[in-house]
């Protein structure tokens, strides 16, 4: 099955509103194993809508259209659909009954303009709307099946899940889809591509793609086959090959994140953590405490942004700050040791750096970050030289901190 998505609305075309409907539909179709080669966006113009529908009908056998079914003058999708189908636009009894029922349910008198939402091509079949006023409709034109849905996301999703997707699934014309995602960091797309050359060799049903989601890269393996057993077998083989090649670069798989992986490792090992943050301003602590249950292992987090805070709260010697500077290996280690002694945690991680845009120098440019990890037996420090704006430096620093904790916990017996 080849499907296409057509989004209608001047607000989408002009970039005033982000088209979340298209991404939602695309994800649902992907999971259903439907091939989606085309997406289009057109404005609120009848002829443009008709021509877009004709184009998509020639390249696909299913088109999902969203937007333009409202009660206002710029909602012209039903008119365009009638012109496309060569069918008169007329009041639909089922849609009229829905409008009446909706008004009674919400105890609200609808404006006469809402009657426009009952107008549909005579050849159309109604798609019920359980949460709004605008019913959708489906029709067949030139051998292609069209589904017209409202643009309001909550209404669109309900109708998509309740009516459209079941109809597509029951057609039996979709493939069996299997996918696997490996999340890696510290390596470029080009390097990944070179490493994984030939990983799908011998499996025509398998493909591999890369998606950058700073500061990580997702390696996506997709298998599309006619039979479930075939798809399961291929994804297992190609997935294992990919995992073995990438090795320790993989920090998470599928729906996991670095945050959830670290949380799971703390729970598994029983270790506890405290933090001392300067340049990240509490971002690492936020990422940890965003997950429920973090109180079981996260004891304390201090944002010691100023030198005075480092001295008063962490016991960093004033002389050390004067001699080495706040952004230094020595101060990072002193911060980590101070956090661990103060909290009594098993591990304490500290970060100090220059997030920018000011504050850098030739010796310590913007993006310079010192990170220290103190444990029972030793305190280690690392120097990072990150690139990007202030937000990116803080984000990648928090990621690097979590990744260090991940590696540390994995090494524990």
Swiss-Prot record:
In which domain of life is the source organism classified?
Bacteria
Q: Which CDD domains match?
A: cinA (cd00885)
Q: Per UniProt, what is one Pfam family of this protein?
A: MoCF_biosynth
Question: What family is reported?
Answer: Belongs to the CinA family.
* Name of the protein in question: CinA-like protein
The organism named in the record is Geotalea daltonii (strain DSM 22248 / JCM 15807 / FRC-32) (Geobacter daltonii)
